[in-house]
Amino acid sequence: VAGKTEEVEKFVEFVTNKDFVKKGDEYSIFKNLMPMPEELEGTTSPSKTINKELIEKYGSDNWYDWCYKNWGTKWGDYDTSKSELMKSGSNENESYVHFYYDTAWGPGSDELSILLCNQFPNLNFNLYYEEPGMSFAGQLTINKGEVIGDDNWELHQNNDDISEIEFNK
């Protein structure tokens, strides 16, 4: 995440969980961008009975289907951590910070990318992901509210690690 220091700090504040209980829960990007409806928390999947009211209201009557539909993954981001805020070169007003997190299955939904663009239009995001178990990786680049790159590729046996891949700069 890069941009004017004040804007980067606002993003960090936005994704910081004030009342976290355990290490790894200090930050939550997915849940703060698109919170799961409270009515769906603690529901079972699949639902034992179909709740038409919840389906009409949220598009789903259980947490699992809602998460997959809205976040593109069943748990959102977890074990999320961040680097220190770093200055960008000689410009004292520009900074960046790296966030690291795990998800189940994939990088997150297009809806989350749209929310990043809309809620933080003055920031730049480079989102890198890899799923070595399923042999895929990718990169999404957002520049001041606009998606300017969305690449994905297969990981091959000779590429054991995302650090071996050449990313767009």
Please provide the spans of the model-predicted regions.
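Intrinsic low-complexity, intrinsically disordered or marginally ordered coil/linker segments
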Residues: V1-K169
